[in-house]
Amino acid sequence: MSQKILFIDRDGTLIEEPKSDFQIDTLEKLRFEKDAIPTLLKLKKFGFKFVMVSNQDGLGTPSFPKENFEIAHEKMLDILKSCGIEFQDIFICPHFENENCVCRKPKTAMLEEYIKHELYDKEQSFVIGDRESDMILASNLGVRGLKYGELSWKEIENEILSSFRSASYQRTTKETDIKVKVCLNGGKVSIKTGIDFFDHMLEQIAVHGGIGLEISCKGDLEIDEHHSVEDVALALGACIKKTLGDKIGIARYGFALPMDECLASCAMDFCNRPHLVYKAKFKKSHLGALSTEMIEHFFYSLSYAMGVSLHLKVKGKNDHHKAEGLFKAFAKALKMAVKIESENLASSKGVI
């Protein structure tokens, strides 16, 4: 099973590297880099596993006795363990660069089992290190590299937590072919469903929800818009759900009450018990090429695909504004509900 793994360099990244001899061979030389421990603790709560990958030039030679190395190394591991941080694997290459061994970073021989058995999720794993060789290792593993020194540990934390809140989803049937990409932290907005008014409504979700949203839909519009609207809702809901993963840290609940000349409200709970309460009446049968009855069906399909309990209500005179109000209210509630506000799961059950 693929895991979210951080492949972490040791010297100069996790602990300070002495510029005099580049060896941590005494306890006096052992110092942790600023914010390394609190960052790893936080990332651990979001399901990341840790693997250490380090080059130790000449380890075991007279200039760098193994017993001297192990005194500081074991102390480092003891301190980390006492804080709640453990490495599931530690890989150390003891060779000099001129020995041209098969294991030295950025070569991947030490990580052969991880590659062979696909033990890491390429989209959600990272290499963290302070040297260019670490960045090349990241490329060789097919993951993103984060260079310590150019980034602080807190900036690395932010980069990691923001990057995994995105996902892509494709739904293909005999009636529609839909591709969706969602980035909860913002990004490109491009929506093409073939139904102009529907595109305008979906754009409200992106703009007012502060999310990146790309949707392309090729559907059987020669029949009517039903299949396209329904399947876009199912694909979008599944994609949003995918971005949240195990939902650790999210607020879970959202509520919005935007007002124009109409009053729209939305309450949302990522409870994994899909339900829709919908109260809206329209005078027109269509807004552009979108049937107004399909607005309710869109939110019904969306709520079930997302796994949310959703309450939507709108009152007003202008049908266009009422429809827009519903989508804006949904967007604002979504923005609130998916916000990371803690390091825990918002449930006494331990699962949502």
Swiss-Prot record:
EC identifiers of the protein: 3.1.3.15, 4.2.1.19
Stretches for region Histidinol-phosphatase: 1-164
Pfam families the UniProt entry points to: IGPD, PNK3P
Record pathway: Amino-acid biosynthesis; L-histidine biosynthesis; L-histidine from 5-phospho-alpha-D-ribose 1-diphosphate: step 6/9; Amino-acid biosynthesis; L-histidine biosynthesis; L-histidine from 5-phospho-alpha-D-ribose 1-diphosphate: step 8/9
GO molecular function terms attached to this record: histidinol-phosphatase activity; imidazoleglycerol-phosphate dehydratase activity; metal ion binding
Gene3D superfamilies per record: HAD superfamily/HAD-like (3.40.50.1000), Imidazole glycerol phosphate dehydratase, domain 1 (3.30.230.40)
Residues involved in Mg(2+) binding: 9, 11, 130
GO biological process: L-histidine biosynthetic process
Subcellular location, principal: cytoplasm
Any one annotated GO CC term: cytoplasm
PROSITE patterns assigned to the protein according to its UniProt record, in alphabetical order: IGP_DEHYDRATASE_1 (PS00954), IGP_DEHYDRATASE_2 (PS00955)
Names of required cofactors: Mg(2+); Zn(2+)
Binding site for Zn(2+): 93, 95, 101, 103
Localization annotation: Cytoplasm
UniProt keyword annotations, A-Z: Amino-acid biosynthesis, Cytoplasm, Histidine biosynthesis, Hydrolase, Lyase, Magnesium, Metal-binding, Multifunctional enzyme, Zinc
Lineage top rank: taxon: Bacteria
Catalytic reactions on record: D-erythro-1-(imidazol-4-yl)glycerol 3-phosphate = 3-(imidazol-4-yl)-2-oxopropyl phosphate + H2O; L-histidinol phosphate + H2O = L-histidinol + phosphate
Cited InterPro entries: HAD-like_sf, HAD-SF_hydro_IIIA, HAD_sf, His_synth_bifunc_HisB, HisB_N, Histidinol-phos, IGPD_sf, ImidazoleglycerolP_deHydtase
Region described as Imidazoleglycerol-phosphate dehydratase: 165-352
Active site: residue positions: 9, 11
HAMAP family assigned: Bifunc_HisB (MF_01022), HisB (MF_00076)
Similarity comment text for this entry: In the N-terminal section; belongs to the histidinol-phosphatase family.
Protein name stated in the entry: Histidine biosynthesis bifunctional protein HisB
Originating gene: hisB
